[in-house]
């Protein structure tokens, strides 16, 4: 069987037999869908390579090339004739389930002497020396057959590579390989600077900019630079106010997907971040970091007025209001103002009657968590406030303050009627009943 050859002054003979793959009908039936897709891709690549070589052999006639099948009619080209110098490429028989279905070459219906009375969906028509290739439903002029192959692959792309774990499909094998690492946890791309590993090489390339300080992506609003384009996109939402990630439970929107995922824990009750010191769980990672300062004793935020230090900047800001007298949180019901937002939220329970804090011992409800803690000492017997004079202890600090007046003789409560003073407010109230008789 004579084989068409391609020769250049610097290269040896190359025939299609060197790259051809042959299947019988029986063998073809044993292949699964992914294997058939792979076969199709390989044959298209090989055929595209051969047909594109005519650009470098403009005056060479390639002659006739036979494609051989082992048994019967295999699913690839039987006999094809390739011409150069802009002439059309024709195929004398194309397997119906292969290239003919793709509209890749002009198909002649019979290789046994029958005359074709119609053209296939894909063909080549010569007009004034320029070859027009009919690509399925899209008739378009291409500069070469290789361009047609690329167009056909775009139009007929199938997602042949399927993940056996989750069923997700991909058009490229390397895309499946990248995805598979999600299930295996494999991170083959390691940073030589810090040892951090990544699933994809592109992620490693972006990460390296942390060490090299390369920040090629600039915000056109404020000039801030970013190492990754994705970070720039997130940053731009600061200027646009865009919040594309909305909670389906409460409608609250977020500028970043990670913030939405963390927020969902509010509704699900999920607290995935555990303190290794005390075992307490938190909804947000940032909350865990703040909490851990309780154990470390770190108090980096110091008040410039009195020198008191705090573990969190937010606590310092709230403390400053003690010195400034600022009370920015105002109750819309009664107009009472508070220095802390949490105090306002608790105060609202006075108007709504809401008592969300329940004692697990007796079932009594309280509007404030602080009130619940004080009450629970009734059940535990805890008396943390001790008098330094006599050693008597109390469940609440207010009880200790009142008791100290026994030792100091202080009587801050004065009767407006007769001027008599009392150490306790309750004693003054009782006394005032004498005047009201």
Swiss-Prot record:
The UniProt record lists the keyword rRNA processing: no
Cellular-component GO terms for this entry: nucleus
Keyword Transcription regulation set for record: yes
GO BP annotation list: regulation of transcription by RNA polymerase II
Compositional bias (Polar residues): 110-120
InterPro entries: KRAB, KRAB_dom_sf, Znf_C2H2_sf, Znf_C2H2_type
Protein name (record): Zinc finger protein 154
Locations listed in the record: Nucleus
UniProtKB keywords: DNA-binding, Metal-binding, Nucleus, Repeat, Transcription, Transcription regulation, Zinc, Zinc-finger
Task performed by this protein: May be involved in transcriptional regulation.
UniProt family annotation: Belongs to the krueppel C2H2-type zinc-finger protein family.
Region listing for Disordered, in residue ranges: 110-129
PROSITE patterns, per the entry: KRAB, ZINC_FINGER_C2H2_1, ZINC_FINGER_C2H2_2
Pfam short name (any one): KRAB
Zinc finger (C2H2-type): 89-111, 133-155, 161-183, 189-211, 217-239, 245-267, 273-295, 301-323, 329-351, 357-379, 385-407, 413-435
Positions in coiled-coil regions: none
GO terms of molecular function: DNA-binding transcription factor activity, RNA polymerase II-specific; RNA polymerase II cis-regulatory region sequence-specific DNA binding; zinc ion binding
Record domain KRAB: where: 14-88
